[in-house]
Structures are given as structure tokens and as C-alpha cells.
């Protein structure tokens, strides 16, 4: 929201937010004790890289070289997380963590496409787009999910499915989401 609200923020508020993004995001990611997520092949990679990329995009006009470095590191390391979707869209962390980790992956891809006109092929990683169909297959007729890993039984609407449907131009990806939205 920093860049969206920039013109409405007081200068002191801008400074506090900018310094927090740098200290709690960029600087922390330089510390090897905290930066293990760069080599992770799971949702931690997507979640952390997404947050850093959003911070870099928000501060790009103010600190372009630092922001560029953050985005380049993201593009270098985020493909490791994409391996989990291959080869055919099955996801190793179950229904719940697909929703969590993939939501950050989708936000990252959408932000890169919005800012730069490309996601540098992230959405084309083997199995990534197919994983939306995997989520439909993970849903039982009664509306709960087949759970494994540490996923709960309760299924819920995954808002990123709307992104997948738009990207794939396939509204059939939304049929189960409608059922979730129609629940009392």
C-alpha cells in the first residue's frame, strides 16, 4: 500500500514505512541466518520472495539499484519453489498449503506482470498452471478436501483460482469456488 497511498501519506509516515521495508525486509534477507528461504523448495520461498518483491516494487523509484537487486535475486531463486508443482500440477503440501503458498506465488507473478509486462516464465513452470485443476480434484463431493501433509479437512474458496481462470482463459476452474462462495 506504500506506493498506492504515497501521495496521501505524511512525509514522516513515508519515512517510517520505507525504513521498515528496508530494515525488516531487505536487510533481513541479506542475513544468512534469515535468508535460508532462498534455497527452499516449498512455500517459504514463494512467501518470502513475494514480500521482498512487493517491497522492491514499492520502493523502486526511490532506491532503484537496491530494488533491482532484490527483484533479480527473487527471479534467480524463486524457480526453486516452482519445482514442487511439477511435473503435472500435483502439490506436495496438500490443499491448505497449496492455497497459502500459491496465493503468494500468484501475487508475485501478477505483480511482475503488472510492473514489467512479464513474469519471466514463472507461470510456465512445469505443473504450475495445471495445479489449479489439482485443487479441484482434491475436493470431495461434500465440499471438504482430501487432506494429506498438514492440511485441514475443511476446504474453502481459494481466491487465486480466479487468477488461474483468467490466465488460462478457462472458467471451468471456478465451478468448485462457486460452491464455496454459496455456503451459508
Which residues make up each language-model segment?
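Active-site lining segments of carbohydrate-active enzymes
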Residues: 1-96, 107
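Carbohydrate-active enzyme catalytic cores, enriched for enzymes
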Residues: 97-184
Amino acid at each position: 500500500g506504500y506506493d498506492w497511498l504515497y501521495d496521501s501519506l505524511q512525509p514522516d509516515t513515508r519515512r517510517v514505512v520505507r525504513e521498515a521495508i528496508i530494515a525488516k525486509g531487505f536487510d533481513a534477507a541479506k542475513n544468512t541466518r534469515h535468508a535460508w528461504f532462498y534455497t527452499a523448495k516449498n512455500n517459504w520461498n514463494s512467501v518470502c520472495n513475494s514480500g521482498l518483491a512487493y517491497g522492491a516494487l514499492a520502493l523502486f523509484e526511490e532506491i532503484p539499484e537496491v530494488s533491482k537487486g532484490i527483484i533479480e535475486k527473487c527471479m534467480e531463486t524463486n524457480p526453486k519453489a516452482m519445482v514442487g508443482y511439477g511435473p503435472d500440477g500435483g502439490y506436495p503440501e496438500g490443499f491448505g498449503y497449496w492455497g497459502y503458498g500459491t496465493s503468494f506465488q500468484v501475487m508475485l507473478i501478477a505483480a511482475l506482470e503488472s510492473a514489467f509486462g512479464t513474469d519471466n516464465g514463472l507461470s510456465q513452470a512445469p505443473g504450475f498452471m495445471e495445479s489449479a485443476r489439482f485443487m479441484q480434484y482434491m475436493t470431495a463431493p461434500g465440499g471438504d478436501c482430501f487432506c494429506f501433509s498438514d492440511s485441514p479437512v475443511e476446504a474453502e474458496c481459494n481466491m487465486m483460482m480466479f487468477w488461474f481462470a483468467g490466465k488460462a482463459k478457462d472458467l471451468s476452474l471456478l465451478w468448485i469456488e462457486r460452491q464455496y462462495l454459496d455456503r451459508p
